[in-house]
Amino acid sequence: EALLRQPAYLMLPEQEREILWAAALLHDVEKRSTSVDEGNGQVTSKNHAKRGETTVRTLLYRDIPAPFNIREHIASLVRHHGLPIWLMEREDPLKRACEASLRLDTSLLKQLTVADICGRISTDKEVLLEATEFFEMFCREQQCWGKAREFANGTARFHYFHTPRSYIDYVPHDDFKCEVTLLVGLPGMGKDYY
């Protein structure tokens, strides 16, 4: 219901509306298995998004067959639906935002999160909505709003995500040329004596 009240949602192409709608329906699917009463009147659902991603992927593969890119987009939205709220509080927010942008449309992610916030019974809605606005500004600044963050090449992307505290625009030397000799044959044909 909160999603339908967003003007940005109504202006989306039909395919993106359906993806967002499915993600909104399924984003908390694993709260049923992860909810724990902490004993102080507080109920937590740690890792429900990670488990939800797996459940959604399985559901959209086995029970309701969906094309690969649509299935993965919905599963990624479910996995990252809390990212706009807590991004700036975590270690290396740039890496997390860029990583998410490679898997999903960050503008759709913000819409999903806003709908989730508006559908809650909560006293801190304004603070959470402000966090989603900061998320949008941060993604725009880092060139990953509504599109995947672009890197100079695949080596630069790999280096950034696999090297701690690396600079996002660093381009490593990529002269990886070498000569390969590949011997193919049946066993016992003399490949060892080439």
Kindly give the residue locations of the regions a language model identified:
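Divalent metal-dependent catalytic cores for phosphoryl transfer on phosphate-bearing substrates
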Residues: A2-A131
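Glycine-rich phosphate-binding loop of ATP-dependent small-molecule kinases
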Residues: R140-Y194
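Charged, amphipathic alpha-helical linker segments immediately N-terminal to NTP-binding catalytic cores
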Residues: L104, A115-F161
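Generic ordered-secondary-structure signal
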Residues: E1, E18, V43, S76, ...
